[in-house]
UniProtKB/Swiss-Prot annotation:
Tissue expression: Expressed in osteoclasts and kidney cells.
Compartment list: Nucleus
Protein name: Zinc finger and BTB domain-containing protein 7A
GO biological process, one term: negative regulation of Notch signaling pathway
Modification Phosphoserine, positions: 331, 335, 537
Domain notes: The BTB domain mediates the interaction with the androgen receptor/AR and HDAC1. Also mediates the interaction with SP1.
PROSITE patterns assigned to the protein according to its UniProt record, in alphabetical order: BTB (PS50097), ZINC_FINGER_C2H2_1 (PS00028), ZINC_FINGER_C2H2_2 (PS50157)
Gene Ontology cellular component terms for the protein in this record: cytoplasm; DNA-dependent protein kinase complex; nucleus; site of double-strand break
Cysteine-cysteine disulfides: none
Keywords linked to the UniProt accession: Developmental protein, Differentiation, DNA-binding, Isopeptide bond, Metal-binding, Nucleus, Phosphoprotein, Repeat, Repressor, Transcription, Transcription regulation, Ubl conjugation, Zinc, Zinc-finger
Organism: Rattus norvegicus (Rat)
Zinc-finger ranges (C2H2-type): 376-398, 404-426, 432-454, 460-484
Length: 569
């Protein structure tokens, strides 16, 4: 190129980074494209993982450590305050830190725990130079952060991070998960039984609580079996505890895997007390109706006591699991047909603790795929729409867009299913058929209303006159258009009698066995009912059906209401 520079040219855009950050902050405030929620003191902070990881080394380690973190959408932390996290979030997205005398101590403490050195240096400088001097800045105001409150928060922060960094799957050999329920070879059954037997012995000896997969001991140190033989150990189930160390090590292990919500979100994953552990085990235990047949087998077994699956401890489940393993290894004549399914249930129960999942529910038809229901909010009316793909259809009700057009009469519709129903008017298609009389209908609700002629069902009733109707629009017309005189109709009205002689004299009274004819205002009321409600319609076979306004129609054929002259006094 003549007179130009040969080669690539780098053109800087100084405002590009600030524009990107501004766009991300706008997405955060509107809740768009946020892939993680930080829960602090009951407040939710939707945000982006990449932004937090780029700003905080603690969040970077939290989001990138362990395989279980790939499924994590919600993190609940209790070692920082909501006000401090709000200020740090604004700093991460706007590059501006807003501090005051009241919150500088909390922000400094949170910045140290979340490893944001720039904020820590600024807050420390403000306190040392007494630019923001407070009467009582608390433990966070100490330059070295050695206050008791900071030490407790630091311990909780390390404990929370350690839970996600120590993946129990990594400490177990692959053979530990080759159970019979997961397509393991038959020759591994003996090894599996020995491993579970050692686990049961450890539980019985009190060496572990049945769910302690997070002990501080290395994988090589394993507890001895119940027979006391040295060197005989359980391969990779419960690591040995140090007798001098406190229970659970430096960071007490979680009592149960973090519970998930409907959308796959996780709750708080911290240590809990013994009472909370019992509650967690009770909630995680399978329901009696969903549990396999091992409960009935336990009632018929050696103990003879009925087992209550609610609140079962892990040791009890392990012992019942061993019983199932023993039955699976016996001959086919002695083993029960559902032992294999029982074994699958136990193995899924305990493997769920390794994988960080909730305890699987019993299902004899196999595992079911759980699909998270999509919830979307309408930007116009803020109505929450449930179901993927339904939001555009809802928005058309606001915009008036009708993309689906009938190619015959050019009528347009907002929904394709409405167009499909409309086309039946042109094609004459009537897919809904009455099984009793053979009448065909184009709409499902027409068939539903027609079936009430056979069943006598009249679900819609006037509160004033107690008159009943087959269809809701008939009741609406009775109340709004024609008006209701408020005179209660006689219960069931007069029975309809087929073949009433036409020569019954007027004023001779009703035929024998019938109640007296209506008098005074009731006669006019019944006449209005007949004028308002009775509608004749031809069914698919050309027969005439007349729906009366009161009483139950007799099943078994069309009936015609008696005329006014039959009931005249």
């Amino acid at each position: 190129m003549a007179g130009g520079v040969d080669g690539p040219i780098g053109i800087p855009f100084p405002d590009h980074s600030s524009d990107i950050l501004s766009g991300l902050n706008e997405q955060r405030t509107q809740g768009l494209l946020c892939d993680v929620v930080i829960l602090v003191e009951g407040r939710e902070f939707p945000t982006h993982r990449s932004v937090l990881a780029a700003c905080s080394q603690y969040f970077k380690k939290l989001f990138t450590s362990g395989a279980v973190v790939d499924q994590q959408n919600v993190y609940e932390i209790d070692f920082v305050s909501a006000e401090a996290l709000t200020a740090l979030m604004d700093f991460a997205y706007t590059a501006t830190l807003t501090v005051s005398t009241a919150n500088v101590g909390d922000i400094l403490s949170a910045a140290r725990l979340l490893e944001i050195p720039a904020v820590s240096r600024v807050c420390t400088d403000l306190l040392e130079r007494q630019i923001l001097a407070a009467d009582d800045v608390g433990d966070a105001g100490q330059p070295d952060g050695a206050g008791p409150t900071d030490q407790r928060n630091l311990l909780r922060a390390k404990e929370y991070l350690e839970f996600f960094r120590s993946n129990p799957m990594n400490s177990l050999p692959p053979t530990a998960f080759q159970w019979p329920g997961f397509s393991a070879p038959d020759d591994d059954l003996d090894a599996t039984k020995e491993a579970v037997a050692a686990a049961v012995a450890a539980v019985a000896a009190g060496d572990c609580n049945g769910l302690d997969f997070y002990g501080p001991g290395p994988p090589a140190d394993r507890p001895p079996t119940g027979d006391g033989e040295e060197g005989d150990s359980t391969p990779g189930l419960w690591p040995e505890r140090d007798e001098d160390a406190p229970p659970g090590g430096l960071f007490p292990p979680p009592t149960a895997p973090p519970a998930t919500t409907q959308n796959g979100h996780y709750g708080r994953a911290g240590a809990s007390t013994g009472e909370e552990e019992a509650v967690a085990l009770s909630e995680a235990a399978p329901e009696p109706g969903d549990s396999p047949g091992f409960l009935s087998g336990a009632a018929e077994g050696e103990d003879g006591d009925a087992a209550d699956v609610d609140g079962l401890a892990a040791s009890t489940l392990l012992q019942q699991m061993m019983s199932s393993v023993g039955r699976a290894g016996d001959s086919d004549e002695e083993s029960r047909p559902d032992d294999k399914g029982v074994m699958d249930y136990y193995l899924k129960y305990f493997s769920g603790a390794h994988e960080g999942d909730v305890y699987p529910a019993w299902s004899q038809k196999g595992e079911k795929k759980i699909r998270a229901k999509a919830f979307q909010k309408c930007p116009i009316c803020e109505k929450v729409i449930q179901g993927a793909g339904k939001l555009p259809r809802h928005i058309r009700t606001h915009t008036g867009e009708k993309p689906y057009e009938c190619n015959i009469c050019k009528v347009r519709f907002t929904r394709q299913d409405k167009l499909k129903v409309h086309m039946r008017k042109h094609t004459g298609e009537k897919p809904y058929l009455c099984q009793q009389c053979g009448a065909a209908f184009a709409h499902n609700y027409d068939l539903k209303n027609h079936m009430r002629v056979h069943t006598g069902l009249r679900p819609y009733q006037c509160d004033s006159c107690c008159k009943t109707f087959v269809r809701s629009d008939h009741l609406h017309r009775h109340l709004k258009k024609d008006g209701c005189n408020g005179v209660p109709s006689r219960r069931g009205r007069k029975p309809r009698v087929r073949g009433v002689p036409p020569d019954v004299p007027s004023g001779a009274g009703a035929p024998p066995g019938l109640p007296d004819a209506p008098r005074n205002g009731q006669e006019k009321h019944f006449k209005d009912e007949e004028d308002d409600e009775e509608e004749a319609s031809l069914d698919g076979l050309g027969r005439l059906n007349v729906a009366g306004s009161g009483g139950d129609d007799g099943a078994g054929g069309p009936t015609v209401a008696a005329t006014e002259g039959n009931f005249a006094t």
